[in-house]
């Protein structure tokens, strides 16, 4: 009660000081939480923020020309029925971060929408550090093998995989499509910088 009376005596300035103090505490708490999340992600061998279960299909680190990329099959959530004859979808994680963002961090992501429509869905992600001497050409080779594997897993599909490459992943898969066009169905490249 004594503090309230003191603040009331200050009038609007007192209200402002209380508000500023509360907002400052909330701001620092948000930064602390973000730091905790960062440390948790950094401690993972393969950090991601996929909201779907996944199982490893291929690990590009084991290839003749290794790259730090991995292909996983996305496990559909309960109640979602996948039709193996529908065109598979492959979402490639953008290189500019360590999470799928629009690709797969929630039900209304690219993966979520594809699975709700009954499509088998895959995700290409990567580890934080490249393999020693890794080049974009190595990544292209690995991504081509990934697409060959998806095609082999769905021999009765209505078409070749629909590949979605967000941001940097878009121009990377465009390079693969330029040399291996037979591996691709539709190619979607949202936010990909191709006009430099």
Residue locations for each model-derived region?
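N-terminal cap/leader regions of alpha/beta-hydrolase-fold enzymes
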Residues: 1-196
């Amino acid at each position: 009660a004594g503090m309230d009376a003191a603040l009331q005596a200050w009038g609007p300035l007192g209200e402002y000081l209380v508000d500023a103090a509360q907002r400052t505490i909330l701001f620092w708490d948000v930064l602390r939480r973000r730091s905790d999340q960062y440390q948790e992600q950094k401690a993972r061998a393969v950090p991601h923020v996929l909201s779907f279960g996944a199982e490893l299909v291929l690990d590009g680190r084991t290839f003749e020309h290794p790259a730090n990329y991995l292909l996983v099959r996305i496990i559909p959530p309960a109640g979602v029925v996948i039709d193996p004859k529908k065109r598979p979808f492959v979402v490639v994680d953008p290189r500019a971060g360590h999470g799928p963002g629009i690709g797969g961090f929630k039900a209304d992501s690219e993966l979520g929408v594809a699975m709700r429509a009954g499509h088998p869905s895959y995700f290409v992600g990567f580890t934080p550090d490249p393999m020693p001497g890794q080049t974009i050409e190595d990544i292209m080779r690995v991504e081509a093998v990934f697409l060959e594997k998806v095609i082999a897993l769905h021999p009765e599909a209505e078409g070749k995989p629909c590949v979605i490459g967000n941001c940097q992943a878009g121009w990377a898969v465009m390079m693969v499509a330029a040399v291996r066009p037979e591996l691709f169905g539709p190619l979607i490249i949202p936010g990909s910088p191709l006009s430099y």
